[in-house]
């Protein structure tokens, strides 16, 4: 049993480090095709899209990238992965997207008693939901590090391991902790896929807004240029997780600007697409929905949660 605060913190860091590195390293096969396409000069200069239609493809490579069952399978088709990479970069460069269809389709789910997650692809130039899966847990059934609602890792992985332009999850109308701001666990989980170059962005969809976590392609290119990109990805995710955790335990009130500034320091953007009835920008006076939101998930509370989890685990 962990006895002191420092012991608990050390245990937590070790646990998180193992979880992040293990999941990043085992996410899927990094193939030479992916590395060559991401690192080729055209992808940096913005010319990849021009080259997609050149040359002849073999019958085995005629599938569109959205037809593959996993990112690993897609990565084995150089032509198809190149098509995806070009489309992904074009979308991230412009981000001129209308989310009305998605918001309309999710309206009833935002009043549910749990979170939902799924995939979105561009169909005729418009974002459309192509898969949606509910969390098996109702709000409050499986509290994890202060979360009011959650999607377990196995459900999220089942969705995120399939090729899609966007992956999303909902923050339903359950209270102050389920607003539009991503949780620290949301960020650390989705970065495992974003830093691989898988998906253009992860969306957090609430009644108030659509928020998108995305990574500039140059950050991805720099990671892939390293001899061991997966270890570098794991290190970056752990750095961000601990920076957000420590800053959030010290800064009160915790605002959207605080979150965005830390993420931007690491080359990650959190972009908000407001709805017509709710407008939010860089207003430092605007707190995230309530006093409760700004105060929960301090480092001490996180350590207390960890002790509770350990106690339950040791008694089973």
From Swiss-Prot:
Main location (coarse class): virion
Keyword list, A-Z: Late protein, Virion
Induction note: Expressed in the late phase of the viral replicative cycle.
Cell compartments where the protein resides: Virion
Source organism superkingdom: Viruses
GO cellular component, one term: virion component
Family: Belongs to the asfivirus F317L family.
Name this protein carries in UniProt: Uncharacterized protein F317L
Annotated organism of origin: African swine fever virus (isolate Pig/Kenya/KEN-50/1950)
Lineage summary: Viruses, Varidnaviria, Bamfordvirae, Nucleocytoviricota, Pokkesviricetes
